[in-house]
From Swiss-Prot:
Bilayer topology term: Multi-pass membrane protein
Name this protein carries in UniProt: NADH-quinone oxidoreductase subunit A
Function: NDH-1 shuttles electrons from NADH, via FMN and iron-sulfur (Fe-S) centers, to quinones in the respiratory chain. The immediate electron acceptor for the enzyme in this species is believed to be ubiquinone. Couples the redox reaction to proton translocation (for every two electrons transferred, four hydrogen ions are translocated across the cytoplasmic membrane), and thus conserves the redox energy in a proton gradient.
Keyword Transport: yes
Taxonomic source organism: Gluconacetobacter diazotrophicus (strain ATCC 49037 / DSM 5601 / CCUG 37298 / CIP 103539 / LMG 7603 / PAl5)
Keywords annotated in UniProt: Cell inner membrane, Cell membrane, Membrane, NAD, Quinone, Translocase, Transmembrane, Transmembrane helix, Transport, Ubiquinone
Subunit structure: NDH-1 is composed of 14 different subunits. Subunits NuoA, H, J, K, L, M, N constitute the membrane sector of the complex.
HAMAP family (alphabetical): NDH1_NuoA
Upper taxonomic lineage: Bacteria, Pseudomonadati, Pseudomonadota, Alphaproteobacteria, Acetobacterales
């Protein structure tokens, strides 16, 4: 006859399944005991909605997200990957010599050029483009003739 410890060592999958069932039962039981009870005034329209805190929703859920969020997210991912390359180069910097240093200088220069291009392109600008104010006193009488 097998002892319980021998059975567990010979059938680890069964022990694993029993442990999962026990943990699931414990979590469901604790959730049922400690969960909120919807009784009386607490049970209403706001408690039946799938929103956090039971707060009634206001407005539409279909909001347009500005493109700037996506641009900044893409730029973050690009520069984050490039920083990983630099951090992986740092431990071998001394062993790489001047040739490795030159390669990293070219790499960082191309990063700086890309950042300058993106900045000049306006991908890092937030909000609407400011309008230029026309100073009619400096423009002369010709620009004010139509007024």
């Amino acid at each position: 006859m097998l002892a319980m410890s021998d059975f567990c060592t010979q059938h680890p999958l069964f022990s694993y399944a029993v442990a999962i069932v026990v943990l699931l039962a414990a979590m469901l039981g604790l959730g049922a005991v400690s969960g909120t009870r919807r009784v009386g005034a607490a049970r209403g329209r706001s408690m039946d909605l799938p929103f956090e805190s039971g707060v009634l929703p206001v407005g539409s859920a279909h909001l347009r997200i500005p493109v700037q969020y996506y641009l900044v997210a893409m730029l973050f991912v690009i520069f984050d990957v490039e920083s990983v390359f630099l951090f992986s180069w740092a431990p071998v910097a001394v062993g790489a010599g001047w040739r490795g240093y030159g390669a990293v200088v070219v790499f960082v220069a191309s990063l700086a050029a890309a950042l300058a291009y993106v900045w000049r392109w306006g991908a890092l600008d937030w909000g609407p483009v400011p309008r230029r104010r026309i100073d009619y006193r400096r423009a002369g009488d010709a620009s004010c003739a139509g007024r």
